[in-house]
Amino acid sequence: MQGVIEVRPENLETLSSGGLDLSYIEYGQVQPAIKLLYAGEEYWYFKTLPLKGYGAVLAGYIRDLQARGHKPILARFFNRIYIYATGITPIGAGKPPGAG
């Protein structure tokens, strides 16, 4: 994963899954980012799902994030759906050196 990608509002689409309409960005063959910036907010990487079959579990992850007060946004990189959300602890943050 690379660093940060700034989301341009004109690139946002809507993805409907599991009764939810979700903000979605199609990046195609670009390396995924650890963080997306959109409308002044930081959306940190949360989880990735395979393109085939994501519909079976996506809504559950999104509803859980929303119930905990996080705003999700989805992005497609290569053949995977990446879930990003506001207010989550970034991967590897808060761990002491050498912990894994």
Residue ranges and their predicted role:
Residues 1-100:
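Acidic/polar low-complexity segments and flexible, solvent-exposed patches
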